[in-house]
């Protein structure tokens, strides 16, 4: 708790690139994302030696940027039984990594049975939400509950309870939203100007 930035990081190896868009501004951010995937594969990134973390039964609160964050390193992981609250509510940071749970490339990651409340954004899944399942979570009193951005799927959002005034934003393709209780607004749009990298299924 009370981490200035992140409580738990399931990050990626710095050798695949670290914040290159901000440092160089030579090309769009999604191009660096493509390159990070390619570099990771060249460095031996695979299911046998990356990811497969379990983050369970934690109370994570009062963090400045995010509660749990991951980029490629969060693949094949399971996040469950956590209570996450008051994340980014002091507005110390602005940007694209603000959420209770913020994952890039959450390939085959399971996020279930968490209670996420009183956050700026509860869960933000970005780039390569592929084989991901968000299931049986309770969202209350967030500014936004869920955002899925620039992903091709497939991913599943099922049996969640979304009670915040703004339930979710979907700027992706390939998602199935099934058996959720949705009490707030929803927004859906196509984001076709940024291509998404992908891995072969379950790799």
Say what each PLM segment does:
Residues 3-203:
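Glycine- and acidic/polar-rich repeat regions and solenoidal domains
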């Amino acid at each position: 708790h009370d981490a200035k930035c992140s409580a738990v990081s399931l990050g990626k190896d710095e050798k695949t690139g670290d914040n290159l868009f901000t440092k160089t501004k030579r090309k769009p951010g999604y191009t660096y994302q493509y390159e990070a995937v390619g570099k990771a594969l060249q460095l031996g990134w695979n299911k046998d030696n990356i990811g497969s973390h379990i983050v369970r039964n934690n109370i994570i609160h009062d963090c400045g940027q995010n509660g749990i964050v991951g980029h490629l390193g969060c693949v094949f992981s399971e996040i469950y039984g956590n209570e996450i609250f008051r994340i980014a509510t002091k507005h110390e940071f602005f940007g694209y990594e603000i959420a209770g749970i913020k994952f890039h490339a959450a390939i085959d990651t399971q996020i279930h049975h968490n209670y996420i409340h009183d956050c700026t954004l509860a869960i933000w899944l970005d780039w390569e939400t592929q084989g991901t399942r968000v299931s049986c979570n309770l969202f209350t009193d967030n500014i936004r509950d869920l955002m899925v951005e620039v992903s091709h799927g497939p991913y599943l959002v099922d049996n969640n309870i979304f009670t915040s005034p703004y339930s979710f934003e979907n700027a992706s393709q390939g998602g199935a939203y099934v058996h959720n209780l949705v009490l707030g607004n929803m927004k859906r749009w196509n984001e076709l100007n940024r291509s998404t990298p992908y891995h072969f299924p379950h790799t």
